[in-house]
């Protein structure tokens, strides 16, 4: 039987990187919204109404994506910590 080895520091680092990426995605979404808000001033009539509806959808989708990515990062971190705690408890039983 082969022993499976986990690199917990690398796994926790990866979870941290995921959180950082979620923050970066949020920043990009804010930048895009700001650019498009500047364009909105030029749009009127049906185009302006369409823009407003589209912007609401865009903002909601961006928020959902960022929330989901944060949730994935938190789940990854929590599961890694749970695995680490369990491994340490098992090792303690064997004197390791």
Curated annotation (Swiss-Prot):
Q: Which domain of life is it from?
A: Bacteria
GO cellular component terms, semicolon-separated: extracellular region
The alphabetized UniProt keywords are: Secreted
* Coiled-coil intervals: none
What the entry lists under InterPro entries is as follows: ESAT-6-like_sf (IPR036689), T7SS_ESAT-6-like (IPR010310)
**Predominant location of this chain?**
secreted
Keyword Secreted assigned to the entry: answer is yes
Q: Name one Pfam family in it.
A: WXG100
Q: Is Transmembrane helix included in the keywords of this UniProt record?
A: no
Intracellular or extracellular location(s): Secreted
Name the family the entry cites: Belongs to the WXG100 family. ESAT-6 subfamily.
The name this protein goes by in its record: ESAT-6-like protein EsxR
Native source organism of the sequence: Mycobacterium leprae (strain TN)
Tell me the gene name: esxR
């Amino acid at each position: 039987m082969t022993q499976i080895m986990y690199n917990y520091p690398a796994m926790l680092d990866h979870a941290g990187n995921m959180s950082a990426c979620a923050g970066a995605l949020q920043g990009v979404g804010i930048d895009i919204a700001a650019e498009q808000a500047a364009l909105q001033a030029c749009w009127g009539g049906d185009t302006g109404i369409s823009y407003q509806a589209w912007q609401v959808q865009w903002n909601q989708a961006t928020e959902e994506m960022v929330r989901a990515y944060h949730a994935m990062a938190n789940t990854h971190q929590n599961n890694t910590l749970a695995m680490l705690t369990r491994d340490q408890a098992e090792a303690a039983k064997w004197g390791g």
